[in-house]
Design a protein with these regions (language model features):
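Short amphipathic alpha-helical face segments that pack within enzyme cores
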Residues: 32-36, 128
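A conserved catalytic-core segment of Leloir-type glycosyltransferases
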Residues: 1, 7-15, 27, 36, ...
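Short glycine-enriched, charge-decorated loop/helix-capping segments at active-site entrances
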Residues: 20-26
């Protein structure tokens, strides 16, 4: 059985191309690092799929790309966007009240597609 990874990158301002590096504190070099990490993981023979899970944002101040539920990155890599919290963009420190809803959505999604995740990874630094 080949491995399936889920990487959480919660704030939502991440996409496969044209990264908005430096837009705010949530869009620094870590977004570039995360994209390189998931692509590298997917290119190993032991890995079948890498899902980058982030927040779906439907805000007129933010590019429409961040409101796409699924974005193909390359074979074995996709960005999945889930709605949790308000439609507008929120910096990561304000997402705490909505994480239970995201957890429920993730469990439901992976049950529905009958997929088991081998490893889940995140690099969160949330001030509570």
């Amino acid at each position: 059985m080949r491995l399936k990874f889920l990487h959480l990158h919660l704030h939502g301002l991440i996409r496969s191309k044209n990264l908005e590096l430096g837009r705010d504190a949530d869009t620094g070099g870590q977004t570039q690092y995360v994209l390189e990490l998931i692509k590298s993981l997917a290119n190993t023979s032991e890995v079948d799929q890498v899902d980058l899970v982030t927040r779906l944002i439907n805000d007129p101040k933010i590019d429409d790309e961040y409101s796409q539920e699924e974005e193909f990155v390359e074979p074995g890599v996709r960005i999945l966007r889930f709605k949790f919290g308000p439609n507008k963009y929120l910096r990561k420190e304000l997402l705490w009240p909505y994480l239970d809803h995201l957890t429920e959505r993730l469990i439901s999604y992976y049950k529905k597609i009958k997929s088991l995740i081998s490893f889940m990874h995140t690099m969160l630094m949330l001030d509570k």
